[in-house]
């Protein structure tokens, strides 16, 4: 610390950067500093801070002071805000729509509204009194510290860029931890970790802490996350069954009565495969190949399934591979498809033509008119054609010599 006593800034109207960190000040008059861009006043004894004239302020670091409240309504250009280690019990952030870094750890916050902060990339709200943390609008979030609160739920399904999470020291049950793991998006590619783990869910010094020892970390690790706590998956009477994305068909889960089990997240493309079922509950797999395809291989956690039912004990990932159905036969008289040694055309005025290679890859998918020729190299293909006017669809297997 470098004590300097009082600071007189009355004659500094053009000041853009002010660093008074660890100077021992208890008051700071910024009335005339209307051009200030960066303010570093951390590690002092400030109990109040008037920022009403600092419209252009972009960075504020006022951590480790004695602030019990702060008015940020004039600081509409703030991008970086650090108020850690104060005594704030509430804060209004609604005007700070450009914030990318927000650090509010070690305060007395019992709630926080982040709905107007879509640009946040780094969020530190650790060691507060939060029972709920709503993050659905923070789609740019990459780093989250929410450890040391009273959270019982944490949904991160809208955070595809998240790469560091510290959530230990909360009150999540084993089921809640599983829900958190399931909500995580796949770990971003190309990220180099600076720490041993990307997800800290427990801590030896935290009491109480999350029951991660009885949760199932596979739900997270299979997506590339490195979790600091092993779990035995024994603490929850429900398990997650994930149906991996498929091509040329789909898999649905159903209970014994044939009722389709709906995904937990029905509107998120990244999470459509997640289903929650009771442990030891027998479930059926409803297999629906696309027209012209059949199921080739069905696995659960890499092991081939011989039937169409299973009884999961912990997280289970279902993979299905569909192949061309060799039993598909061309119609006796085609009204839509014409074949020559050079390729395929349509007999309809307009048809949507889709051509698949023998390994199931889409080779061509375009509307064509009568007489237009789609040339094909030598090989075997599956062709579907839908006549736009008649609404008829034909499927035919084609061999180009």
Predicted features along the sequence, with ranges:
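Consensus "Asn ladder" position of solenoid repeat domains
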Residues: 2, 23, 44, 65, ...
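Conserved hydrophobic beta-strand positions in leucine-rich repeat
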Residues: 16-20, 37-41, 58-62, 79-83, ...
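Surface-exposed interfaces of beta-sheet-rich extracellular modules
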Residues: 280-307
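C-terminal tail/sorting-segment detector
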Residues: 326-332, 380-401
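Short, surface-exposed loop/turn motifs with a glycine/proline- and acidic-biased composition
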Residues: 361-390
């Amino acid at each position: 610390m470098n004590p300097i006593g009082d600071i007189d800034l009355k004659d500094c109207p053009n000041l853009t950067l002010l660093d008074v960190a660890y100077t021992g000040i208890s008051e700071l008059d910024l009335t005339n500093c209307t051009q200030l861009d960066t303010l570093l006043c951390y590690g002092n004894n400030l109990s109040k801070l008037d920022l009403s004239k600092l419209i252009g302020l972009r960075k504020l670091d006022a951590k480790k002071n004695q602030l019990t409240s702060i008015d940020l309504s004039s600081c509409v250009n703030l991008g970086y805000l650090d108020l850690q280690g104060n005594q704030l019990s509430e804060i209004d952030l609604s005007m700070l729509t450009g914030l990318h870094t927000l650090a509010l750890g070690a305060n007395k916050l019992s709630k926080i509204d982040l709905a107007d902060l879509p640009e946040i990339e780094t969020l530190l709200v650790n060691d507060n009194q939060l029972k709920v943390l709503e993050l659905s609008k923070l789609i740019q979030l990459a780093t989250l510290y929410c450890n040391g609160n009273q959270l019982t739920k944490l949904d991160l399904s809208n955070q595809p860029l998240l790469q560091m999470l510290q959530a230990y020291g909360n009150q999540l049950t084993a089921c809640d931890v599983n829900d958190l793991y399931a909500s995580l998006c796949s770990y971003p590619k190309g990220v180099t970790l600076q720490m041993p783990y990307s997800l800290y869910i427990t801590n030896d010094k935290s009491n109480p802490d999350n029951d991660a020892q009885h949760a199932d970390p596979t739900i997270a690790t299979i997506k590339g996350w490195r979790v600091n706590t092993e779990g035995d998956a024994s603490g929850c009477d429900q398990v997650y069954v994930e149906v991996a994305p498929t091509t040329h068909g789909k898999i649905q889960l159903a209970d014994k009565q044939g009722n389709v089990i709906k995904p937990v997240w029905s509107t998120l493309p990244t999470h459509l495969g997640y289903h929650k079922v009771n442990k030891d509950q027998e479930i059926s797999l409803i297999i629906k190949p696309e027209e012209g395809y059949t199921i080739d291989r069905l696995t659960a956690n890499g092991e081939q399934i011989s039937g169409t039912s299973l009884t999961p004990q912990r997280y289970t990932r279902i993979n299905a591979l569909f192949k061309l159905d060799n039993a598909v036969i061309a119609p006796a008289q085609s009204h839509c498809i014409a074949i020559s040694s050079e390729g395929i055309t349509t007999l309809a005025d307009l048809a949507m033509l889709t051509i698949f290679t023998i390994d199931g890859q889409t080779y061509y998918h375009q509307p064509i008119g009568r007489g237009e020729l789609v040339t094909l190299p030598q090989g075997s293909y599956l062709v579907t054609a839908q006549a736009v006017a008649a609404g008829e669809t034909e499927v035919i297997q084609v061999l180009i010599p």
